[in-house]
Every structure is written in C-alpha cells, then in structure tokens.
C-alpha cells in the first residue's frame, strides 16, 4: 500500500473542455488501473494553492492508484483572483449556467466522455475557497454529484460579495436556516436524490470560523430531511464523527470538527495507510480526510 511519499508533477494538463466561461485551468490524473465505468473525484484547491500542490498535500493521486479513481483538478488563474481563490462569493460565479461553475461542469463532461466515467459515481471535494466552491457545485449542479466533501469551507450563497465573504469567514451573520435551505432549492430545478455530504473543519480555524461547518450541516440537514441532533456519534482515529441518517438508515451527512486544528486539510502522512505531505494548509493531525472521505463515498471497498 502506498505511503505518504508521492512524486511531483503527477497531473496532466487538460487542453480542451468547452467554452470555459470562468476562464479556469484544468488538470487530470487517470491511474493506469482505472476501470471502465470507474468513479471520478473533482478536487478543488484552496487559496494560494495550485492543483499540483493540493494533490501532493492531500495524497489524492496515491489513493487513486490504490483504488482506481479518476481525478479532475480545476485550477484558478491569478488573472481571475490574485490569491488563486475560486470566486464562490461572486454572483456570476455561483449560478448554474454561468462563470466558474459552468467551466467546472464542462470539464466534468469532457472527462466523462474521454475516460468512460460512471455518471452515477461523480464526487466533488475542496478546501477553503475550494470548499466554498464545492458548496456551489453541489447546489448548482446537484444532478451531477453522488457526494460532496467540504473542508474548511462555507455554505452555498452565504455571501454575495467580497465584504460579506470576509464577514462570513469570521463566523458572523449569514442566512437564516430557512434561507439556507431555500438557497439550495432555488439554485436548480432538481428534486433529488441529493448528494451525501461530508464536512471537515478545524476546531481552531481562525481563517474560516468553524461556525461555517455547522451552517453547512444545517443547510443540508433540511435538504435531506434529517433535522435535529445526529443519529449517532462515533470515534474515528481519535476524533468524533457525527452522523445523520435518513429514514432508510443511509448515512447522508457526516461532520468532523478536528480539535486544535487550524485552517487546512487534515492529513495523516505516516503509516501503512498514510497519504499526502504536510505543508501550508495541509495539516498533519493523525487523520486522513482524503481516505475517510473516499471511504464514506464507497470508493475504497
């Protein structure tokens, strides 16, 4: 089984993927053992990161080799945002059929066509601005995704401009619970079944307050009709995992608040099941969000 050591520059530049109204770049990683009708994970990097740096830190391509997963890495251009952040708070980049979400949708369509992806097994994850853009994709193109994982992110449409975004990141204000539900439902005509949701956040995150994690959970609790306290709480790698199950007993939402962790993606680089490398915003805390997210989605079985 692979360890945390991964080679650099593992990704392949994606040359063509539609009209690209959001003016994004894209990279892919298709493992040699990728099967026909295999799954696809869309991975969205955070601010000041690149597709390659996030892949290296998170270890997604190592897990892809292990489990036969195709990866798509949308990448922001500095001409769009000087910090390389996805523009999740701009109205033109948070609507179906427009801007960055449409670019990402076009990338997905191209990868599905090029590599015979199973359209029922497409997933999306991201950290920080990539986590917030994950919320955007889950709301604006819900028919595309079987699951989403939001790391150190924010709820869909919690902010509509940069000033609001900065305030929300600090944990202040934001839509009511009723409005959080309505924002997702108004983003498309989709009526379900909805993606399962995995939420990860540092308990000591001073960049994006972990109140946002709870808001994300509440947004999707209403969509999945699982309001109220978690169905159960269990311990995984020493951290509490809260789980909400629907009426059929399916786990539809999980939440991890990693005590003592700051802003970033939780990784476990060492050991037989280690993935990734510690770096800025890639935080060694003894639990691999990458591996556990993939397991939640049924990709490690």
Where are these regions (language model features)?
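A domain-start/cap signature at the N-terminus of enzymes
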Residues: 1-40, 52-70, 96-99, 119-121, ...
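Cap/lid segment of the alpha/beta-hydrolase catalytic domain
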Residues: 75-99, 161-162
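A conserved short beta-strand
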Residues: 144-155
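Structural cue for short, hydrophobic secondary-structure segments
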Residues: 43-46, 73, 199, 257
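Conserved alpha/beta-hydrolase "acid-adjacent" motif
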Residues: 207-212, 266-267
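Short beta-strand/loop motif that positions the catalytic acidic residue
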Residues: 199-201, 205
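Active-site glycine-rich loops that stabilize anionic/oxyanionic intermediates
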Residues: 46-50, 261
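Alpha/beta-hydrolase active-site loop
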Residues: 92-115, 136
